[in-house]
Amino acid sequence: MSGNEFKAKAYLKEGCPFSFKFLVFMSEAGLLDRIEIVRMKPHDPGFEAEKDKLAKHLGKAVTFPVVEVEPGQYQTDSDRLIERYAAEAGLTPDAQPVLSFYKQTIFPQLIELFQIKHPKTAKST
């Protein structure tokens, strides 16, 4: 990568099943070199300030993961992000066995727990 080439920045919230789903796909697809991972730790002092910055870029409340896909262009929604990177790489998300396993077994259980803990912020993507 040349010095001026843009590298997407992925803001992944620790403990977030949606962030983990995106990370599972990117890892399994061999695409981790396309993103810079920013670990968002809810208990870190700068978490809320960084989240507020992301909200300003998005123009709405933040849901994770958030990826700066192009300079100044931010996208959320794990499924849309997976579809985007899969299409760019000529891959089919459902053909990824680890991602499929996660989505069919572990992910639904995590969503159930997430909805109990965060009833107002839970989503289904």
Language-model segments: residues:
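Thiol/selenol-based redox catalytic cores and closely related redox-interacting motifs
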Residues: 42-125
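Local sequence-structure signature of Cys/Sec-based thiol-disulfide redox active-site neighborhoods
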Residues: 1-39, 43
